[in-house]
Amino acid sequence: MESQQLSNYPHISHGSACASVTSKEVHTNQDPLDVSASKIQEYDKASTKANSQQTTTPASSAVPENPHHASPQPASVPPPQNGPYPQQCMMTQNQANPSGWSFYGHPSMIPYTPYQMSPMYFPPGPQSQFPQYPSSVGTPLSTPSPESGNTFTDSSSADSDMTSTKKYVRPPPMLTSPNDFPNWVKTYIKFLQNSNLGGIIPTVNGKPVRPITDDELTFLYNTFQIFAPSQFLPTWVKDILSVDYTDIMKILSKSIEKMQSDTQEANDIVTLANLQYNGSTPADAFETKVTNIIDRLNNNGIHINNKVACQLIMRGLSGEYKFLRYTRHRHLNMTVAELFLDIHAIYEEQQGSRNSKPNYRRNPSDEKNDSRSYTNTTKPKVIARNPQKTNNSKSKTARAHNVSTSNNSPSTDNDSISKSTTEPIQLNNKHDLHLRPETY
């Protein structure tokens, strides 16, 4: 009987039944299924009475809302949670591509959040350590990084005191411009070193110290994807990723090569600006050094024209090469090759003069004899004095007395002069010059 009434009024009977059941309050711990037959009859009578009252109620009357009444609409059933991870922890497609990396394809759905690292990058210990990024995640590149935040918890302290406060690893800043990529990649490499991944960073020869694992490669890809948006990457980085969007190691290797190239460029510019040459080294070696520096700078995009190169070279010349500054300063179209021709000419002249000089040592007596004789370059007449004259010289009055006595004697001739103790001065007179006796 009751079942027929419930079938005739399914909605009303369902609501009435729920209202009667939910309005009851159970004050005991008795099992609700353990009910006697008399109790069941009482419930049936109460239900029949409630149904009769519902039939007399007008359809247009408003029924007050009872919070204990069940909703007549079907309840929404939550979708099943498939897999070992809860639904709220799974990453959506937008979360998987936080930086708009459509250029790199579809990254894998990692089960952990982008700001959480695997425990394999930390010192071993009985407790899993998951470093979490502080509130400075995503700061611009100009934000300074504190030194205190770039360290890890020591393994010994982690084993001894597991309740100590963990130190966080500051993540790299967000890349905001292609021009900032060289500076950004330095902070990213520092971030990998602080994450105990310094062994996978490529060295000078382009190879890492140790092989990289698949988990580490995934970590590189995910962190590079998060902090380096594709729209701010340089063209050469996009070219690498267009071939393999996971080849982050090649990007790091090329970045390190560019860092070394930039350092070499700075060294070449400093060397070229501080050139010094005085002929102490061969001119060929000096020319090779300068031309190699200029060629490297030109190949790296720093063009050094002939005018600037010649000015830098001439500014460093000294010694006998210094006059090249003044002989060539008016030549506007002078090339580096022409300047080195002049340098080679001076260097060869220096070497020739050094080879022509005698290498033996002169005797002191030769130097003494040379000091006593000299050649008069203004007059063709050469005067040679007798070295014994200084030892046997007489006074002027004695010589005059000898001359007067020789003139008074009848047998005086030119032979008497030759027999005198004082020898006359021998002159090589080519111009028929006569000297008075008083002059000698």
Curated annotation (Swiss-Prot):
InterPro entries: TYA
Record's compositionally biased regions (Basic and acidic residues): 429-440
Amino acid composition bias (Low complexity), ranges on this chain: 153-165, 402-418
GO cellular component: cytoplasm
Keywords annotated in UniProt: Cytoplasm, Phosphoprotein, RNA-binding, Transposable element
UniProt signal peptide: none
Protein name, per record: Transposon Ty1-OR Gag polyprotein
The organism of origin for this protein: Saccharomyces cerevisiae (strain ATCC 204508 / S288c) (Baker's yeast)
Compositionally biased spans, kind Polar residues: 1-10, 48-60, 127-152, 419-428
